[in-house]
C-alpha cells in the first residue's frame, strides 16, 4: 500500500474520533487523547498569542468556556488531506462580559505528526 494512503487513512481515523468526541461535548478528552505534548495552537493574528503545550491549551479552553455562553454549536467534518484535517464550527454564542450575542463561523486546521495533533490553526469570522 502507498505510504500516502496509510497516512491519509491514519489521519482519517484520528480525525473522525476527534470530531466524534467534540460532538459529544468531550473536547477536553479529545485534546488529551490527540494533542501532542508540545502542541501549538494559533488563533488569527492579534486575537490572542499562540499557546503551546497541553496545559496551555486546556487553560485556553477553560478561558473560552468561561467567557462565552454557547447557545448552539454545529460541527462539520472532518475533511482530510494527507496528515491534515479541517473541522468547521458554527457557533451561536453570547460574550458574557458584554452580553453581545453573535454567530461565529470558525474553521480549525489540524496537522498531525507521529499520530498526534502537533498544530491547530484557527480561521474565523463573526457577526
Regions found by a protein language model. Give the residues of each.
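Terminal "cap-and-tail" regions of soluble proteins that handle hydrophobic small molecules
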Residues: 1-24, 33, 55, 116-118, ...
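A solvent-exposed, acidic/Ser-Thr-rich amphipathic alpha-helical stretch
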Residues: 8-9, 16, 28-82
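Short, cysteine-centered beta-strand-loop-beta hairpins and adjacent loop/turn segments enriched
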Residues: 66, 93-103
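Short, surface-exposed coil-to-beta transition loops
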Residues: 71-73, 88, 102-108
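Short beta-strand edge/turn micro-motifs at domain boundaries
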Residues: 105-127
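A short hydrophobic beta-strand element
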Residues: 82-91
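Short beta-strand segments enriched in hydrophobic/aromatic residues
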Residues: 35, 91-93, 108, 123-124
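Residue-level signal for well-ordered, solvent-exposed loop/turn and beta-edge residues enriched
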Residues: 40, 100, 116-118
Amino acid at each position: 500500500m502507498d505510504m500516502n494512503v496509510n497516512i491519509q487513512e491514519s489521519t482519517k481515523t484520528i480525525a473522525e474520533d476527534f470530531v466524534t468526541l467534540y460532538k459529544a461535548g468531550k473536547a477536553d478528552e479529545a485534546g488529551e487523547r490527540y494533542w501532542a505534548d508540545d502542541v501549538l495552537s494559533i488563533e488569527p493574528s492579534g486575537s490572542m498569542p499562540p499557546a503551546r503545550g497541553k496545559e496551555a491549551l486546556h487553560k485556553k479552553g477553560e478561558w473560552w468556556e468561561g467567557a462565552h455562553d454557547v447557545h448552539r454549536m454545529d460541527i462539520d467534518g472532518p475533511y482530510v488531506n494527507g496528515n491534515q484535517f479541517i473541522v468547521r464550527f458554527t457557533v451561536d454564542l453570547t460574550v458574557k462580559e458584554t452580553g453581545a450575542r453573535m454567530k461565529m463561523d470558525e474553521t480549525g486546521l489540524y496537522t498531525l505528526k507521529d499520530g498526534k495533533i502537533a498544530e491547530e490553526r484557527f480561521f474565523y469570522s463573526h457577526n
